[in-house]
Every structure is written in C-alpha cells, then in structure tokens.
C-alpha cells in the first residue's frame, strides 16, 4: 500500500536480532519470529541484512540459520516492471560439449534491440530426464552466471539430466 508499487525489502539488524530473546520463546533469539512475520506479509518481497560484516561474524549462528533454514536456494533479483517490463529473448544454440575438463554447456546470448533488453545474467536449471521443467523451483538452479557457458557437474553418467538456461536483464 505504501511502497508506491515498488518492491519492498525490509532491513534486518543482525546484532539486535540475536541480542534479544523472542518474547514468545526466551530460549531463542528473534530471527525465527522475524522470518515468520516477514514471510507472512505479501507486500514484503525480501530483506537486507545490516551490517554486512556481521554476516561473516555469524553472531547467534545468524548466517548459518539463513543458509541452512531460510535461504537454502539461490534467489533471483526481482523484476522491476516499472523500469523495464520486457524480458530478454531466449538464449540460442544451447549445446553440451565434452572437454578435457568434462561436460560444458554453451549457449549464445540473445540479440537485444536496446541496452535495457540486453541479457546480463543467465540462470541454469537442471532437471532429471523426463521431469517437467518448473522454473519456479529454486532448488533446480545450478548456477546464476554472467558467462555464456558452465561446466556441468558429472556424476558417472548414472542419471541423465536436461538443462534449461534463461536470460535475465
């Protein structure tokens, strides 16, 4: 309502979050309650952690909890349709090549008419052969990269995979 149709990301003070106990459960700090509240609010699209050095310090296992419980999978930068509402075209010439370093997936960047339509990153998804490709499942993201290739994980060829690459601008 008050974010003027813009993405809303709230700030989390890491040290204050771990310094005080959760009023509903004094055996833990406030991160679980804050994450539950944040995720219950449909207008909040994420959070930023302040200050960044505290992430490395990991007070109260804050970083570990984020990595293991709350942010296990990569996140994509949200779209900003108020700035640019046209997605880049699809990548071209997706091809896997065996190299001395193992399998590498190559693709060609899509052509862009304007700078705003130019692809700057690519998301590589991996699905088991025959599995329906669900691009909303972040657990299927293998990489987010600026390169137009990626060395693929190889697991002795026992499981066959299909890869999907999407472009981001």
Residue ranges and their predicted role:
Residues 61-117, 157, 169:
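Pro/Thr/Ser/Gly-rich low-complexity, intrinsically disordered linker/stalk tracts
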Residues 140-146:
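Short beta-strand segments within Ig-like beta-sandwich modules, predominantly Fibronectin type-III
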Residues 2-5, 40-43, 98-99, 116-118, ...:
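A structural signal for short secondary-structure junctions
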Residues 21-22, 135-138:
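Short acidic, glycine/proline-rich loop/turn micro-motifs
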Residues 1-82:
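Substrate-binding cleft of secreted/luminal carbohydrate-active enzymes
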Residues 110-136, 160:
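Solvent-exposed loop/turn segments flanking beta-strands in beta-repeat/beta-sandwich domains
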Residues 151-169:
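Beta-strand-rich modules
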Residues 104, 121-123, 164:
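Conserved beta-strand and immediately adjacent loop positions that scaffold enzyme active sites
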């Amino acid at each position: 309502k008050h974010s003027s149709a813009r993405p809303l990301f709230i700030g989390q003070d890491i040290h204050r979050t771990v310094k005080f106990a959760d009023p509903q459960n004094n055996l833990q700090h406030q991160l679980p309650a804050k994450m539950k509240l944040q995720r219950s609010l449909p207008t909040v699209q994420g959070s930023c952690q302040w200050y960044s050095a505290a992430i490395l310090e990991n007070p109260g296992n804050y970083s570990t909890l984020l990595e293991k419980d709350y942010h296990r999978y990569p996140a994509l930068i949200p779209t900003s349709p108020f700035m640019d509402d046209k997605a880049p075209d699809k990548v071209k010439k997706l091809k896997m090549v065996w190299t001395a370093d193992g399998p590498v997936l190559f693709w060609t960047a899509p052509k862009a008419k304007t700078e705003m339509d130019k692809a700057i990153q690519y998301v590589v998804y991996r699905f088991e052969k025959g599995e329906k490709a669900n691009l909303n499942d972040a657990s299927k993201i293998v990489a987010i990269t600026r390169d137009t290739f990626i060395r693929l994980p190889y697991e002795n060829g026992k499981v066959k995979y299909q890869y999907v690459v999407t472009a981001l601008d």
